[in-house]
Amino acid sequence: MAERTFGWVQEAYVIENLKRVVSLFVYNSEVNQELRWDKIPRLISKEYGRDIFIEELSKETIVLPYTHLKGKGTPAGYTRSDAPCSGIVQATLPGQRKEYQSDWPADSFLRWAVSIGFLNYDRDKDTCELSKLGLEYTLSKGGSQEEKDILTKALMSYPPACRILALLDTCGHMTKFELGAQLGFIGEAGFTSIPQPMIIQGLSETNSLKERGKLLQDTEGTSDKYVRTICSWLKQMGWVQQLEKEITIKIGNKEYTDRIGQAYQLTLLGKTILKYSTGSSKFKRIPKRILWDMLATKATDRDYLRNRRTHIINFLQNTYKTPEEVLTHLESKGIDESIETVIDDIQSFQNIGLTVSQQNKSYKIMDDIVGLQIPQDKSEQKLEKSSITLLKDQIRQCLKHVNHKYLVLLDLGFDGTSDRDYEFQTVELLTGELQFQGARLGDSRKPDVCVFYKQNGLIIDNKAYSKGYSLPIKQADEMYRYIEENTLRDRQLNPNEWWNIFDRNVNHFHFAFVSGSFSGNFKDRIQHIHMRSGIRGAAINSINLLLMAEDIKAGRLSYEDSFKLFDCNEEVIMG
């Protein structure tokens, strides 16, 4: 069975192009004819399915394999820019420098159409066909009130769109980073947001237009990308307006001010439309479309998480239930969980756009839910938690003061592709959740993170490794070089003068390596750095970093004493 992920959409922006994709399923529609008579014969070779595609589009009732719609990726010998057209939706969508799009945008538009209910997806057959609402949409005249009403019904059934509208209604003017930080499942890979202070600091420290553009356009977490995509739809509907926002932050003794262009405000029309999500006498609440796939995305045990969350959502739809009652219900389904996990899931349902009501210590989902069903093959399997989820369950119960969103550090620390996100979340924990000062540096010839408190400073190297970090000699030498540069503070040694991140009164330093876990001869390397530099340091994994943060925030460990943990020249193990 094919593995598809519906419910979360990136890089599909233009509503008119969405209509083209949906319209191809209507036999003899303008788009359908254009594809059969012109685009597919010209753009797609027989090798890539030309004749089969034309035959499939020539039927009265069109049901298409997902693979035929999406097409193939970039074949060997081609680049993404010159890859041949190999899918029906690729040929449907106009490109910027060519007549068609690649498989990635094609997949994004298909996800969009399925996620808001214009297409029905058959999981067993891996096919798509037009829904009743999708047919109504294709038959509506472009720009008409009928079309707007259908789009309203579809978009307001999409929980993440409702979440963004609700946040803007409550908080006013918000950037994509502020919105992204509150969208998605708590402490989970697949829902990361770049801490906004890091962006503002970076913008303020560069005069390069190229670097500013890179920070504003390319530096995003996954949730930030979802926000940007969804807000593009809401702008086209006239529900939000994009308006630059000025942000001022303070890091250490320095104040940084800059502007972020991707910031949004609710319009009067948007405020009115939001009532379809909350419901009122004049605005009947539109049912929310939740697909099983959207209940987890990147976690290795996502099917387990999707099933657990499906059971909780179904259980909370009828009457108010306590977390203890939810636990009993999960046990009846063969799922063993903790109160803390259940509460995080319930809070996350609000974060993805469901309306969750709380009375005393009981919860109820106020929305009517459509589309949510555990696939038969997934309901019959005995799904197990991953080792990461088991670790999260263990640590979650210990975090009474630290925000559970930082549990994502457990995912990121073992994901070798997420170094940057790991650095961002580490510094956000230390400077946002806690009261250390400092920032992510993370560029060439700079440490990843530096933090300080009063006279104590810590130079941090973040390393995300799937099988444990052994601290190779090259990285050990790199840390020694940072220690030496910080000691000498000679611009000729390093013109970027990264050490200026520390206040002038900081005079007692440690170094630290942060990773998911450690392996090999890392302790010997730490000892060697100490012997060469005279500076003490340690390794600390994500679990112990979180436990340290909890002890600090709970008042069991002072900020000054937290630095003493790094005197050991080996691995920090909390209580």
Predicted feature descriptions by range:
Residues M1-H404:
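Donor-sugar nucleotide-binding helix/loop cap in glycosyltransferases
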Residues K378-G575:
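Catalytic core segments in nucleotide and nucleic-acid processing enzymes
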